[in-house]
């Protein structure tokens, strides 16, 4: 069964919509195989988003991701990566389709409520970043 990583970002955690977002996953056939609430350190955020290190938004992204706790989940299901990305909606909530997580809960392209793996290969890397094998069941 396919797995993907989801992060409910600090803006959505602060708004108290964790349960509503998790319900979207479960009611659309994605099973929560692992989950934890964490406060990322600056080093963790920099390492997780290292692929964006040379991009102009990197510093702001890191600062945002350490601004409050996040909820990190492993989602499992048929076509989990693509299904999660469809549920999240476009990166910019103004462009996200109505009924998607970002259209309903995100404030801006920066505070956009959720992160999801963009490929199976990256899902494995991202899952391994946050979870030990025995934490996923």
Swiss-Prot record:
GO terms for biological process: CTP biosynthetic process; GTP biosynthetic process; UTP biosynthetic process. It is found in: Cytoplasm. The active site is at residue 115. Its cofactor is Mg(2+). SUPFAM superfamilies: Nucleoside diphosphate kinase, NDK. ATP binds at residues 9, 57, 85, 91, 102, 112. Transmembrane segments: none annotated. Its EC number is 2.7.4.6. It catalyses: a 2'-deoxyribonucleoside 5'-diphosphate + ATP = a 2'-deoxyribonucleoside 5'-triphosphate + ADP; a ribonucleoside 5'-diphosphate + ATP = a ribonucleoside 5'-triphosphate + ADP. GO terms for molecular function: ATP binding; metal ion binding; nucleoside diphosphate kinase activity. HAMAP family: NDP_kinase (MF_00451). Major role in the synthesis of nucleoside triphosphates other than ATP. The ATP gamma phosphate is transferred to the NDP beta phosphate via a ping-pong mechanism, using a phosphorylated active-site intermediate. Belongs to the NDK family. This is Nucleoside diphosphate kinase. The gene is ndk.
């Amino acid at each position: 069964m396919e797995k993907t990583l989801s992060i409910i970002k600090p803006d959505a955690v602060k708004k108290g919509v964790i349960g509503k977002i998790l319900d979207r996953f479960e009611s659309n056939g994605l099973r929560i195989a692992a989950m934890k609430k964490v406060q990322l350190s600056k080093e963790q955020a920099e390492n997780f988003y290292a692929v964006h290190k040379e991009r102009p938004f990197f510093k702001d992204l890191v600062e945002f991701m350490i601004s409050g706790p996040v909820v990190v989940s492993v989602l499992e299901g048929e076509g989990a990566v693509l299904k999660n990305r469809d549920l999240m909606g476009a990166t910019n909530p103004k462009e996200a389709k109505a009924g998607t997580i970002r259209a309903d809960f995100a404030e801006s392209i920066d505070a956009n409520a959720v992160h999801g793996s963009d490929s199976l290969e990256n899902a494995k890397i991202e899952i391994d970043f946050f979870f030990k094998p025995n934490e996923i069941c």
